[in-house]
Amino acid sequence: MAETKKLLRVLAGEVLDTPPIWMMRQAGRYLPEYRATRAQAGDFLSLCYNPELAAEVTLQPIRRYGFDAAILFADILLVPQALGADLWFETGEGPRLSTIGAQADFDRLKPVDAIHETLSPIYETVRILTRELPSETALIGFAGAPWTVATYMIAGRGTPDQGPAHALREGNPALFDALIARLTAATIEYLSAQIEAGAEVVKIFDSWAGSLKGEAFTKYALEPCREITQALKARHPGIPVIGFPREAGQGYVGFAKATGVDCVALDNSVTPDWAAAHVQVDGCVQGNLASSHMVTGGQALVDETRRIVEAFSKGPHIFNLGHGITPDADPENVQLMIDTVRKG
């Protein structure tokens, strides 16, 4: 039977007249229905670990907008929590974790095969979604890349320059490499379990890849992504992988060939014309509208959306933002973006 899900067709290399569309953080605080469900859950982590409510918020933007893909509602920091790190969220400050700064901290982490005990509700969310999503909607699972997750585990929070992680990488490379190896192995198991539960695509979010330069980018962004991708493809032939080395700049060039990912997601620091010439030549790209347009809307949103669609029209393209949609976005601007992509 011919594949009917537009996202999967494009990930297989097909060029469509109208690209499939979804948004990073499409289940989020900009939607009133999300805010109501989150209030019902009590807090963010309780929402992540409640399969029925997590499935509900995943479905909300599909009901409202008819996106071509749903992305599992979860968080990249559930993996360190499953490995034994303490995780909590401070109001107005974002995530906080117990820190990894010495060998003794690392030694307290759980083995990789212990993560499923904590993460089993996430897999149940996937199973619910496979039953409830429309037949034309693809389901995307995801995880954070080892480098990005490590930056939070080392600093205990998000940092503007990932300084603590760079300091450990340079000052105690053996410990840092051991942490990256543990996270790489855990990410393989986590994504594999999502696929076994029903995810049809997986995405690896390397939000802080851009702070790695030269050999460090190769060793800690590119190589772990390649290891994860190769392991998943060996276990689950035919499951596409999207890589997102955010703000990689020139590092986007050749990333798909070097890692084996089926699609490279782009942030909006690179222009569509440049990316079409230098990245899309290797296959599918995803992106890359600035999320600020979801706040401001208007003709600028329409014009930029059309420019991106046109720039990537010669090859496989998934329309998306260059970063997650923000809480102050206007839901009507999301509809305007979708209408522009689908109707021209």
UniProtKB/Swiss-Prot annotation:
Places the protein is found: Cytoplasm
UniProt-listed Enzyme Commission number(s): 4.1.1.37
EC category name: lyase
List of residues binding substrate: 25-29, 75, 152, 207, 323
Site (Transition state stabilizer): 75
Role description: Catalyzes the decarboxylation of four acetate groups of uroporphyrinogen-III to yield coproporphyrinogen-III.
NCBIfam families named in the record: hemE
Designated name of the protein: Uroporphyrinogen decarboxylase
Species assigned in the record: Ruegeria pomeroyi (strain ATCC 700808 / DSM 15171 / DSS-3) (Silicibacter pomeroyi)
Gene that this sequence comes from: hemE
